Amino acid sequence: MEVEVGQIVNTHGIKGEVKVKSNSDFTETRFQPGEQLLVKHNNTEIVYTVASYRIHKGFHMLRFEGINNINEIEHLKGDYIYQERDHQDIELGEHEYYYSDIIGCTVFKDDDTPIGRVINIFETGANDVWVVKGEKEYLIPYIEDVVKDIDIETKTIKITPMEGLLD
């Protein structure tokens, strides 16, 4: 199964480098030279092999093998990038999940009151933070004191909110 790992938001320079906004976990592994990525463009799937990878101003900068000119890649602006979900170099530990497993889950308080759906995840130094959209937008830290249960099969998450978390 494939998971979405990013979107090509622009080109960079004239030698065929693309600027990618990642919406995935494990980007340091997924975007390494030699990795294969699938780009879906106009109902066509194109497989590219990463030739180079670097981070520049918060974006992931990629060059693909065989692409040496902006004209060969410019038409992919706005397209999404995918990769096999179960990457051979990624091992999940206990209580670790793929972003794609968490995004879309419905979050409930421990009394079964629905709060909203996880729409985004961002990394902080200490822990991930889930953006949950309900009546308002809430920032839920992925920490043991708050997140009590995650059921990937039913796409549900139970939390015990800290005081002020949902205000």
Swiss-Prot record:
GO terms for cellular component: cytoplasm; ribosome. The keyword Cell membrane does not apply. It is found in: Cytoplasm. SUPFAM superfamilies: PRC-barrel domain, Translation proteins. It holds the Pfam family RimM. The keyword NADP does not apply. GO terms for biological process: ribosomal small subunit biogenesis; rRNA processing. Gene3D superfamilies: PRC-barrel domain (2.30.30.240), RimM (2.40.30.60). Keywords: Chaperone, Cytoplasm, Ribosome biogenesis, rRNA processing. GO terms for molecular function: ribosome binding. InterPro entries: PRC_barrel-like_sf (IPR011033), PRC_RimM (IPR056792), RimM (IPR011961), RimM_N (IPR002676), RimM_N_sf (IPR036976), Transl_B-barrel_sf (IPR009000). Residues 94-165 form the PRC barrel domain. The PRC barrel domain binds ribosomal protein uS19. PANTHER family: RIBOSOME MATURATION FACTOR RIMM (PTHR33692:SF1). An accessory protein needed during the final step in the assembly of 30S ribosomal subunit, possibly for assembly of the head region. Essential for efficient processing of 16S rRNA. May be needed both before and after RbfA during the maturation of 16S rRNA. It has affinity for free ribosomal 30S subunits but not for 70S ribosomes. Belongs to the RimM family. Binds ribosomal protein uS19. This is Ribosome maturation factor RimM. It comes from Staphylococcus epidermidis (strain ATCC 12228 / FDA PCI 1200). The gene is rimM.
